[in-house]
Design a protein with these regions (language model features):
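Flexible, acidic/Gly-rich N-terminal and inter-domain linker regions that tether
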Residues: 1-104
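Conserved Radical SAM active-site core
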Residues: 92-95, 101-174
Length: 174
C-alpha cells in the first residue's frame, strides 16, 4: 500500500458517499465507487473509468483501492486451494477454497493468530497478532481465483470472528 493513503476497500456505501461529498463530488459517485470495488473488483482508482479524470486524480492523491493479491496459493489433489495473504500488521492469513459437487465455499480469516488457544486449533499456538480490517477480510473474497463461482463464504479461517465483531459485521454488510 502506498504510504499515507487511506484504503477504500471495506467502506460501506454510506461511508463512500460521505467521502465523495466531503471532496465536493456528487453523491452518486459513492455508488459508482462501490460498484467498481465490489462488483467489478478493480485494483486501482484509474480503472474507475466512469469517474471523471479530475475525480480519479483527486481520489488517487489521498486514497488507494487496497486490493492485494495472494502471496501464495497451493492446490491439493481434491481441488481444495489454500491462499496466503499478507496483511497490514505484517502477518500472513489463510483463505481456503473448498469445492464440492453443488457448492463452492471459501473459508476466510478474521484475525492474524488468535487469543482463544483452543486445543484443536493450531492458529492459537501462534499467538494473537491483530484483527483484520473489514477491507482485509473482503479482500480475501475478491482476490481468489474462484471468487466468481462462490456459493458460500464462512468465517472459519484464522481467528475468532466474534472477537473481531465490528470488522466482521462490517465486511458482511458490504
Amino acid at each position: 500500500m502506498p504510504e499515507g493513503k487511506e484504503i477504500l476497500l471495506g467502506r460501506t456505501l454510506d461511508e463512500l458517499t460521505e467521502l465523495v461529498t466531503s471532496l465536493g463530488m456528487p453523491r452518486f459517485t459513492g455508488k459508482q465507487i462501490a460498484q467498481w470495488l465490489y462488483d467489478k473488483r478493480v485494483s486501482s482508482i484509474d480503472e474507475m473509468t466512469n469517474l471523471s479524470k479530475a475525480n480519479r486524480t483527486l481520489l488517487a492523491e489521498r486514497y488507494t483501492v487496497g486490493r492485494t493479491a495472494p502471496v501464495m496459493s497451493q492446490l491439493s489433489k481434491d481441488g481444495t486451494r489454500k491462499y496466503l495473504f499478507a496483511v497490514s500488521t505484517g502477518g500472513l492469513v489463510e483463505a481456503v477454497f473448498i469445492p464440492d459437487k453443488d457448492r463452492a465455499t471459501l473459508c476466510i480469516s478474521s484475525q492474524v493468530g488468535c487469543k482463544m488457544d483452543c486445543l484443536f486449533c493450531m492458529t492459537g499456538k501462534q499467538g494473537f497478532k491483530g484483527n483484520l480490517s473489514s477491507g482485509e477480510i473482503i479482500n480475501q473474497v475478491l482476490s481468489v481465483e474462484e471468487s466468481a463461482s462462490l456459493t458460500n463464504v464462512v468465517y472459519m479461517g484464522m481467528g475468532e470472528p466474534l472477537d473481531n465483531a465490528t470488522n466482521v459485521l462490517k465486511s458482511i454488510s458490504v
